[in-house]
């Protein structure tokens, strides 16, 4: 799981202020971090089907948020994708 310190670091990096947890950028960054954690977990635990299902749900949630953000603000979307290192 993501530690509190790591979560706070992501919030301060992507948020507008240190308490900004609801903005789209922060949500996408936090979900991306959880996806990376679960991907590593599933590499060593191949038969953990409940975690795999959770990973697929997170990927879908992130995809929906990215689609919304792309429609809302294309330039900021592109910078966010580059910052997170996502392929788009």
From Swiss-Prot:
SMART domains xref list: Ribosomal_S15
Superkingdom assignment: Bacteria
InterPro entries membership: Ribosomal_uS15 (IPR000589), Ribosomal_uS15_bac-type (IPR005290), uS15_NS1_RNA-bd_sf (IPR009068)
Keywords associated with the record: Ribonucleoprotein, Ribosomal protein, RNA-binding, rRNA-binding
MF term (GO), any: structural constituent of ribosome
GO cellular component: cytosolic small ribosomal subunit
UniProt key word GTP-binding: no
The keyword Cell inner membrane is assigned to this record: no
Pfam families attached to this UniProt entry: Ribosomal_S15 (PF00312)
Annotated function: One of the primary rRNA binding proteins, it binds directly to 16S rRNA where it helps nucleate assembly of the platform of the 30S subunit by binding and bridging several RNA helices of the 16S rRNA.
Subunit organization: Part of the 30S ribosomal subunit. Forms a bridge to the 50S subunit in the 70S ribosome, contacting the 23S rRNA.
Annotated PANTHER family: RIBOSOMAL PROTEIN S15, BACTERIAL AND ORGANELLAR, SMALL RIBOSOMAL SUBUNIT PROTEIN US15M
Family to which the UniProt record says this protein belongs: Belongs to the universal ribosomal protein uS15 family.
Protein name: Small ribosomal subunit protein uS15
Organism listed in the record: Borrelia turicatae (strain 91E135)
């Amino acid at each position: 799981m993501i530690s509190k310190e790591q979560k706070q670091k992501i919030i301060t990096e992507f948020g507008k202020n240190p308490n900004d947890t609801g903005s789209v950028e922060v949500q996408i960054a936090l979900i991306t971090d959880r996806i990376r954690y679960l991907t590593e977990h599933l590499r060593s635990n191949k038969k953990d089907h409940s975690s795999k299902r959770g990973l697929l749900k997170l990927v879908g949630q992130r995809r929906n948020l990215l689609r919304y953000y792309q429609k809302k603000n294309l330039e900021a979307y592109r910078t966010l994708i580059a910052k997170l290192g996502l392929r788009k």
